[in-house]
Amino acid sequence: MLSSNDQKLEKLDSFYRPPVSKQRTSAEIISEARNALRTVRTQRPFTPREDQRKLFGPASSRSPENRPPSSFSLHASSFELSDSKPISGTRLRPLELKPKAPASPGTEDACLSFPKAPLDPAKIRKISGARARFYRAASQGMLLPDRSPPAAHSKTVDESSKPVSVGSSTARRNGTHLTASSATGQLKSPPLLTCDQGFQETTEQEVSLLSQLRRGGDPGKRRARASSCPSSSDLSRKETRAASRASSQEQETDTEVDEVFWKARIVPILHELENEEDIEEMCAACTQLHRTLEEARMLGKKFKRRTVLLKALYKLVDADSDPLSLKLAKLILALKVSGKNLLNVCKLIFKISRNEKNDTLMQEDNILESLLEVLRAEELQSNTEAFLYCMGALKFVSGSPGFLTEMVNKGAVEILAQLIKEMTEDTEKHGVCLPDSGHLLVQTTATLRNLVDSPLTRSKLLNMGAFPHLCTVMEQHADDKDICTNIARIFSKLTSYRDCCAALASYSRCYALFLSLLNKYQKNQDLVIRIVFILGNLTAKSNQARELFSRETGSVETLLTLFQSFYHHKENSPKLQLSEAKPQAEAEDVLVKLTRVLANIAIHPRIGPVLAANPRVVGLLLRTLESKSLGDCEELVINTIAAINNLSFYQVKSSVLQHRKLYVAELLLRLLVSNNMERILEAVRVFGNLSQDHDVCNFLMQKNVHKFMITLLEAKHQDICFSACGVLLNLTVDKEKRAILKEGGGIKKLVDCLRDFGPSDWQLACLVCKTLWNFSENITNASECFGDDVANTLLILLSTFLDEELALNGSFDQDLESYHRLHWETEFKPVAQQLLQRIQSHHSLLEPLPVPSF
């Protein structure tokens, strides 16, 4: 006789899925999500690597005549000297009230000469040799003097060739007295380039004074001179003029120091470049020149001899050597050229970067820093074309793994993001795009697309809040397919990561933007597939994204229109040869991504029932299953079944699937006869939802599906065992069908699942206990119901698993441990306790006596 507690247990109904209207705990929601609703994953669309490095690849929407060229010729004559004039830092002297008499020819300026007139073109044509031609032309008056003297044009400056007098405290150079504490003997130095068509010898005194003169003479005197200047409020007009003259004299001294440094240190290197024939030696000389100028702080625009130096560097471009040109370009950029020269040097680097073999060369020369400095320091509006080729070079090298980390560490992400922000703000301000800004944005977004492979890039973009700016670019340039495709590729990569996906999902304007682009580019597979992939990522990870997307007008209709269009394209295309099958495969890939979005948004409790009641949605999904053979487009079939599975979860009267449930079950039967376990798993999941209906259960019994479910319990695959057990649970709700568990050793296989997966999967353990509970509803003897061995095994397993210390003594991290405890306490424990009590109350440890023989 059963106790009162046992009688109460016996009155419990069979386990089945609770009605949707019943309030559920969080554990039940998680469990149901595993049973019926789940998001669908898919691969990111493949972007093939372009064979050639060009500004715009073969897939570009720009016609060749409407885009900047990737191939061009570049020579020394392409550069301009007008840009090379240095910025003067000299302060003008106050005007003297009394006129001064003209200086005599013997005064300090007598050594200077006026600039010579340009050479006769006929003479220039007679000069042969690239480098020799430059240096002869440079020495015949092309090197501009510091000041304009009254002397004759062709007169050689005598004072410039005189040695510094030994023992004198003053060294006279070009008519200017330079202070020096001492000077020692005279030794030969490398020849110097002078303004009278030749090189001259330099004395050691000139070289020995450099270090002191570069510091401005005697430090004590400089400090005394500086400290002796009174405040401006106390100066009389006379004192002001005196102070101004003192400052001017100091600047003149610095100028003369630069002149000595130029002749002693720079000209010898230029002389070497003139006479050297070996490219490696010329590269070494360029490196030495760059280092020397950097040490002397002569880089930038204020160097007086900058014009002469730049002209020398421009001439060397004709050597047509990538290693040499790269070093020249780096030095020219360091001299802060602008205008056409900046454009040409960026073109020069772009030209070099087109050859992938030069990547190592560019990395060794650290050209990245120079390119990024152009983008960081120069003005965008006046240098858009230069930025274009600069960014093109960065795009090429950013695709090389060796440059990725270096570019990110050097601030490339911040520079690109700021550039994008600046262009979007200018467009918003003026209402029109800057000239060539579209071309520049193509290169910028393509570069950023390569950089987002770095985790540090993703972190920086999140911290900068760059996603809205990228969306704004797509809005402003919606007619530019190249820009939209690049940004779609960026978001395709970023939304594959949870934090980036959440950031974009929270930007509510993105959904209307994506839908607008889908409607605009319906026939452009390359763009459509990426936007749909992004929407699939957003709706897979965020219920808010499902809600926001579904609220947009025409959201579902847009998906269905695309689905129907690409479905017809796929179905109406004849069977193609392997080489011609690419468009057909791309159409299938779009359908894969579209079914994924439908499956994901169906998880939302408000959207799911609406989709299930939409005949067009269900019709397209079923038509896909009808037309696909088992060997055709594996992923599309699986995603379609997953979408049907999520829709079949909603047991509402308006559901089209509920009205066609038997037809759906028949379609799914053929998927069970497959070697693909993923297909089988998806089909079994749908049966788990459909088998809640009595008619479907009868259909499954007629087709012996229950036997297949019992066989699947041996799969040793948790998800397959879970889904198969769910179908058996629904079948055993009917008392007449409970005996099926005895077929094929079903009871023992269920107990084996409990033993194998229980400690790691309390949801599966709960499902097994529910199925055994249904099976044993009319139990009178545990041994007769389960068998002696199975009953004893059940008693041991249930007793062990109900011991909290033993059951939850797993090596899990804190979050996973909390998850396991939640399911153990709320799902497994209540059912297991009931089942254990039932077995114990109907189980005797006494062995029956043998029947005596007479």
From Swiss-Prot:
The keyword Repeat applies. Keywords: Differentiation, Repeat, Spermatogenesis. GO terms for biological process: cell morphogenesis; cilium organization; flagellated sperm motility; nucleus organization; sperm axoneme assembly; spermatogenesis. Transmembrane segments: none annotated. Residues 58-73 have a biased composition (Low complexity). Required for sperm flagellum axoneme organization and function. Involved in axonemal central pair complex assembly and/or stability. This is Armadillo repeat-containing protein 2.
